[in-house]
Regions:
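Predominantly cytoplasmic-facing regulatory/coupling regions of multi-pass membrane proteins
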Residues: 1-90, 157-282, 311, 322-325, ...
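Membrane-interface alpha-helices at helix entry/exit sites of multi-pass transporters
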Residues: 84-88, 101, 106, 117-132, ...
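Hydrophobic/aromatic residues within the transmembrane alpha-helices of Major Facilitator Superfamily
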Residues: 62-63, 98-101, 136, 248, ...
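Extended non-transmembrane interhelical loops and adjacent amphipathic helices
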Residues: 90-116, 216-226
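Transmembrane alpha-helix termini and helix-breaking/packing motifs in multi-pass membrane transporters
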Residues: 142-159, 340
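Membrane-embedded alpha-helical segments of transport systems
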Residues: 95-99, 122-147, 178-182, 284, ...
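Transmembrane alpha-helix interface/packing and boundary motifs in multi-pass membrane proteins
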Residues: 92-101, 279-298
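Interfacial segments of multi-pass membrane proteins
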Residues: 112-122, 277, 281, 299-319
Length: 356
């Protein structure tokens, strides 16, 4: 592959794979050193119950990926095969894992979808629709939480102010939610009201250094972008219902992973509150400047969920640190590993031909 082709996917270079691993593992090691007491785990019996719930946690992550694959099939009108859809999902998650949470892998995902068989215009429309559905999940469910869970239960974490207006977690969530809401409004406007404006936005994105190789293609695909956006507007209600249902299954499965990790070691009663706090956690993680939320995610987990650990108060933080590491081990690091394996081959298959 020539230098120009490599530069186009420079955002996924090896150093960006290593960086989140160093940050995440470094923060975990720091927490282990400061707050972890391995002797307390001698009182935990690791038996078939633990194995069962850990297997369920892994299956829930698989369910999450299956939901994403089904959604991609729906949004692409079945033009992308099942195998290619699976590859795109894992490549997309890999890109998200090595970029800051606020950025995600959206820009590069357009290339992944395009190389799976769609034109650039339709690829952009599919990726934008995917982003819209993801954010819509948070926009809808976050306000609904307050119907079933009081703000006191959501944000009243020990060591932090019980006054919600003085609680830093509350303001993290509010700012994150406002950012998501603004993005959904802009994206919805572009997809369903002003596709020409969406086209201009996509062209601006393709001026980024690592996407500049496709700038000319993006200009030529202007008509495709407008056509695809109009096509999405004409989709029937059932199309969007199935797409959003797949989205909801994916995100909900991801959140239940933590519940199963708690069940593997403790007796848990407040499952819905744990689920609700995770949704809030992911909104707060939008503000993380680190790739994949590395470090910040572990910190939020430890601080935001430790009081649900059913053990002696003096041992809660030690258990929380261990669970935070196990959580990321199941829900984050596998995407780095899988992506690091399949990305080089994807690179060879899709770019070597253009250099011969």
């Amino acid at each position: 592959m020539d230098h120009k082709g490599f530069k186009a996917i420079d955002s996924l270079r090896k150093t960006r794979i290593i960086y989140p691993i160093i940050v995440g593992c470094g923060f975990i090691l720091y927490m282990l050193y400061k707050e972890f007491d391995p002797s307390i785990f001698s009182n935990i019996s690791f038996g078939w119950n633990s194995i069962f719930w850990l297997v369920i946690a892994i299956l829930l992550m698989l369910m999450r990926d299956i939901g994403y694959v089904i959604r991609l099939k729906i949004l692409s009108d079945g033009e992308i095969s099942w195998l290619k859809s699976i590859k795109v999902v894992f490549l997309w998650e890999f890109a998200s894992a090595i970029t800051p949470s606020a950025i995600g892998g959206t820009s590069v995902a357009i290339i992944f979808v395009h190389k799976a068989g769609l034109n650039i215009g339709k690829s952009a429309a599919v990726v934008m629709a995917t982003s819209l559905l993801d954010e819509l999940y948070f926009i809808i469910f976050f306000p609904l939480l307050f119907i079933f869970v009081s703000p006191h239960l959501l944000f009243d974490v020990e060591k932090y102010s019980s006054n919600i207006l003085l609680n830093s977690f509350y303001w993290f969530a509010v700012v994150g939610y406002c950012i998501k809401l603004i993005w959904v409004l802009l994206l919805g406007y572009g997809l369903f009201i002003n596709p020409v404006g969406l086209r201009k936005t996509i062209l601006f994105v393709f001026k980024l250094p690592f996407l500049r190789r496709w700038k000319k293609n993006a200009y030529n695909a202007g008509a495709d972008i407008i056509f695809s956006s109009r096509a999405l507007r004409k989709k029937p209600f059932i199309f969007w219902f199935k797409s959003f249902l797949a989205t909801a299954v994916s995100w909900t499965s991801r959140y239940w992973v933590v519940n199963t990790l708690f069940l593997a070691f403790f007796i848990v009663h407040d499952h819905f509150i744990i689920f609700a706090r995770q949704l809030v956690m992911w909104i707060m993680m939008l503000l993380s400047p680190t790739p994949g939320g590395s470090g910040f995610a572990e910190f939020i987990f430890k601080e935001f969920l430790f009081d649900f650990i059913n053990t002696d108060p003096e041992n809660m933080l030690s258990y929380a640190v261990g669970l935070a590491f196990l959580w990321r081990l199941i829900s984050y690091y596998p995407y780095l590993i899988i992506g690091a394996i399949i990305f080089p081959r994807w690179l060879r298959d899709n770019f070597n031909k253009s250099t011969k």
